[in-house]
């Protein structure tokens, strides 16, 4: 999540009910896990990017959609999606770029009937309360409509329709994305490109929760990754090993989450994001 530098301190009315203790405990947990970078001192540190060698055994979860879960306490999950499948449908939020109530990735997956859903664009929040209104801090395009403006110096992931199916493309900047011809059907801002033409780009080795996207086969194969205790380099290495030749980072930290069949893949306290990408399979439609 991207903090809003113009936020004023929120004022809350006294709570006069027997559930005060539980409410306070809830807010304490929220501030502990969402208002600062996650503390990974108690998590597995078994991932070693320098000696990484993963044998990806994909599990089919639907037509053209495959899942792989790492062995080390499910440190990460990666989904491989065949975008050339004509039965794929894209779901996305939000429907406008104004301040609005956020929803969790799980809630989004449920009401859109998405097989796979993942958080995308970084965002602003009015305050640090769990149900604060939010809005995207970067590019969002849905059904060719620009929902949120581009943000300078940050990357973008886009989807284009062609011949009854989709293909994806990753852009170094969001301005490059909106100036592309043809115009994207869907686009989501992120932070940085981490893998370009098969080359892993250098980043500081800071571990956190991560959400990322990768592409292969001329954009026809999409990889979506969500994991814990990972650096940007780790994400790039995992996606490259899975077959991607280009990849980028979505919003990370407490906002990271991916749902498959409406089940959360990261077991943690979630900050509800402003923008979500979902994949549906609609056979015979």
Please give the residue ranges for each predicted region.
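Short, low-complexity, intrinsically disordered N-terminal modules
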Residues: 3-6, 31
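Bacterial N-terminal signal peptides
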Residues: 23-31
């Amino acid at each position: 999540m991207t903090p809003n530098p113009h936020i004023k301190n929120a004022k809350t009315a006294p709570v006069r009910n027997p559930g005060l203790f539980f409410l306070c405990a809830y807010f304490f947990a929220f501030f502990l896990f969402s208002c600062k970078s996650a503390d990974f001192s108690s998590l597995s540190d078994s991932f070693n990017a320098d000696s990484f060698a993963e044998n990806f055994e994909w599990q089919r979860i639907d037509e053209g959609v495959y899942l792989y879960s790492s062995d080390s306490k499910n440190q990460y999950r990666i989904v491989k999606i065949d975008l050339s499948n004509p039965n794929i449908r894209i779901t996305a939020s939000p429907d406008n770029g104004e301040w609005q109530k956020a929803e969790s990735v799980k809630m989004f997956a449920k009401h859109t009937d998405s097989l796979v859903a993942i958080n995308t664009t970084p965002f602003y929040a009015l305050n640090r309360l769990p149900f604060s209104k939010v809005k995207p801090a970067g590019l969002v395009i849905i059904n060719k409509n620009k929902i949120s403006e581009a943000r300078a110096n940050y990357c973008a992931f886009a989807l284009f329709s062609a011949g009854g199916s989709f293909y994806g493309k990753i852009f170094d900047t969001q301005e490059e994305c909106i100036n592309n011809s043809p115009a994207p059907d869907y686009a989501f801002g992120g932070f940085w490109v981490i893998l370009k033409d098969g080359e892993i780009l250098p980043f500081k080795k800071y571990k956190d929760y991560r959400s990322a996207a990768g592409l292969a086969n001329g954009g026809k194969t999409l990889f979506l990754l969500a994991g814990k205790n990972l650096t940007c380099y780790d994400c790039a290495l995992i996606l490259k090993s899975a077959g991607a030749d280009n990849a980028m980072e979505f919003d990370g930290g407490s906002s990271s989450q991916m749902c498959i069949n409406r089940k959360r893949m990261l077991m943690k306290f979630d900050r509800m994001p402003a923008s979500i990408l979902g994949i549906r399979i609609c056979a015979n439609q």
